Amino acid sequence: MPYAATPCLVFAGQAKQAIVYYENVFAMTRRRIIMDEAGDTVYHAHLSNGAFELMLWDESAAPNTSSSLHLLLTFTSLEELEQVYLRLTTDGQIVTPLAVADFGGWYAQVRDPFGILFALSFSEEGRESEALLERE
């Protein structure tokens, strides 16, 4: 049985800023947002761009953090990966620069301003790393 996984990101008062950031970086649209009466706290937000979805909200107490969380996004074209990489690196920190990885295919890691690490990947079927290097 296939399952879809939707990342749920929890913030300590930064969810409003994260919504705007992810809308711009990933060309996402707001499917649903529930906020407090003052408009300061996000109780629930659901963003989508047709390829993947994000849910996010603010927690009143400091959110629990995992020891390590990476969100791997697999792209259908190198151009699409490069566009998202450029938008992420505008305000984010490059952890692994975009390059052909030893394991084949294009790969990068960027930590966004909210501390979320995005791993970006693209691979052409049947192509080895050496063949991908010819595209540079």
Where are these regions (language model features)?
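Short, solvent-exposed beta-strand edge segments and adjacent coil->beta transition regions
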Residues: 2-6, 66-70
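Vicinal oxygen chelate
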Residues: 2-3, 33-35, 43-48, 59, ...
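Core segments of cupin and vicinal oxygen chelate
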Residues: 8-52
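Short hydrophobic/aromatic beta-strand micro-patches
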Residues: 10, 72-74
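Glycine-centered flexibility motif
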Residues: 13, 66-68, 108
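Solvent-exposed, flexible loop/coil residues
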Residues: 15, 73, 107
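A short alpha-helix capping/helix-coil boundary motif
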Residues: 23, 62-65
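Contiguous beta-strand/loop segments that form the cofactor/metal-binding neighborhood of enzyme cores
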Residues: 54-56
